[in-house]
Amino acid sequence: MIQLKENQGIPRSILLMMSIIAGLTVANCYYNQPLLELIRHDLDITEQIANLITVITQIGYALGLFFLIPMGDMFSRKKLILVNMTIAALMAIVMAVAQNVWMLWGASLLIGACSVIPQFFIPIAGQFSTPENKSRNMGFVLSGLLTGILASRVISGYIGEWLGWREMFFIAALVMVVCMGIMMLMMPEMKRNYVGTYRGLMTTVAEIFILHPSIRIYSIRAAFGFGSMMAIWSCLAFHLAQPPFNAGSDMVGMLGLCGIMGAVAASSVGKLVPRFGIHKFSLFGAAMQIIAWAIALLFGDTYAGLIAAIILVDIGLQCQQLSNQSGCLQEIPQASNRANTIFMTTYFIGGSLGTFCAGYVWTQADWLGVCIVGISFAFISLMISLSHKK
């Protein structure tokens, strides 16, 4: 078995494996988005109740980030990942057989919490890569994660339309079992970065948050960028179900292909961050999201307008996420999992807030309200970047 040493480099095979599994595991959090209209009809629930499935999944992810990712500094990361995969597979089966919304909500919470596996991988890429390749390799893993997000929407949209939404979650459980087998064969064990109690570990997370203002800035402005992006996806299925589209879940999935530009951008941003700097990329990303939402507001009743908005809001987010996450992990490399916990927990709180706000205003002001939420979140991110030079 290969042994990894800090700053000494990672074999390409391990990076590729982490990138692929990052995509397959994070997909668990996004299968539900194109299926919301189908679930709503099947269980006879309102749009706002159905939207909470996505909100609760994001909350679960944030909880997993906060309580589980710090353990990567204290326990075997390989074993933690395998346990999370097992629970995610079981909860996908619960989703598939759920007969009421309470089962869906409970399973969604645990699926979200146990799908944080990519956030073990990204610090691994940062910790063990050679210094000149850290941002590039983190971007490579992140591009796999983003490809998983966009592929999950496309695949679940089509499977939901032609086989049914429950079948999608049975398939998700099978995918997790396959990933477990690959992990057991390929993933090496890694040296732990912390010796002590779990309580002491979590205390250091709070200390890092208090003592490192740069980490707070990186995390909060990226969180508002993620909230802006989640606003469009949380209500897209409802928007497309209305005239002039009258489209099904397969069309929601097709629009997920637009996100491929975001995946491509992640790899490019990882190479360019050291040259142009974190601050410039964060500013650029927030500005691009504002432009995207202006297009969604003016041309959101056309496929061309929606496609342009989705592409731009996604590329804008990747510029914000990778640049700010890279800065966060480089701030304290010896505590990379804990720094990543702060960043990603804040990030997904922002995503949950964007999802909730968009879902609420959809019932009050339809697509106009969703666009206002998206623009507002992107504008806040822009203002934070303008008021801080890091």
Regions found by a protein language model. Name each.
Residues 2-8, 187-220:
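Juxtamembrane intracellular "pre-TM" segments in multi-pass secondary transporters
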Residues 63-101:
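Conserved MFS/SLC helix-loop-helix module at the cytosolic interface between two early adjacent transmembrane helices
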Residues 65-76, 264-278, 362:
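Helix-to-loop junctions at the C-terminal end of transmembrane segments
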Residues 80-93, 280-294, 375:
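Structural signature of the two symmetry-related core transmembrane helices
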Residues 103, 140-187:
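Helix-loop-helix hairpin linking two adjacent transmembrane segments in secondary transporters
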Residues 107-144:
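Cytoplasmic helix-loop-helix junction between adjacent transmembrane helices
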Residues 117-129, 319-332:
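Intracellular juxtamembrane helix-capping segments at the cytosolic ends
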Residues 279-324:
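C-terminal transmembrane helical hairpin of 12-TM major facilitator-type secondary transporters
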